[in-house]
Amino acid sequence: MKILVFGKSDIGDGISQLYSETVNVPKEECDVRDEVQIRETIKKYNPDVIVNCAGISHVQVVKDSSIENWKEELEVNLLGSYLIARESISTNMFRPMIFIASVAGMYGKPEHSGYSASKSGVISFVQSLGLEGYNAYSISPGRVDTKMREKDYPGEDRRTRLTTLQVAEIVKECIEQKYAPGDNIIIRKRGFRKLKRVDQGQPWKVYLNVQPLGTPKTI
């Protein structure tokens, strides 16, 4: 199996670590806003699975925000997901596609309006893909121990964060089809729980599969 990861991210490193001995996991740094680069990358690797980890965040209150930063967040986080999905479907409509969203896409966050809006769009977009019959999933982690998190929240206690390997484990479960297409899988460090949204009519209210992710010693 070959898993193509878009975005040179820490989560991508976690996926590589999880599959290091059994699966080819190329990571591609192409500009996800460029449909030509995406098309050429998918053609080059012809992957069995695509994971989009590419993302960007700007810390800014709305009053002092710039249009350029807002556009960049929407284009990288949301438009990039759309372009990757469209190109993936055009070559293999049955290929699993996994998009790293965020719990920030489920509610607003101060100083992260553009990021929250873009990730909310990713979650809804993946739901649409699932309803159209495509094998797409979104994963919405809480705090993850990444360089981007450290940039946005310097000095934050790293013990409150998920590891990238834990997020990779949920990617693996999506590949193994333990969830339904269109699902958004929410994982939080608090309580060591994994939550799966199952009620299409009332999102974020009904959950299944509440189970331990591990113990404090392993997290």
Task: Indicate residue ranges for each PLM-predicted region.
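Active-site loop-to-helix junction immediately N-terminal to the catalytic Tyr of the SDR YXXXK motif
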Residues: S65, G108-S116, S128
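Active-site helix of classical SDR
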Residues: A85, S118
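Residue(s) in the substrate-gating loop at a strand-loop-helix junction
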Residues: S102
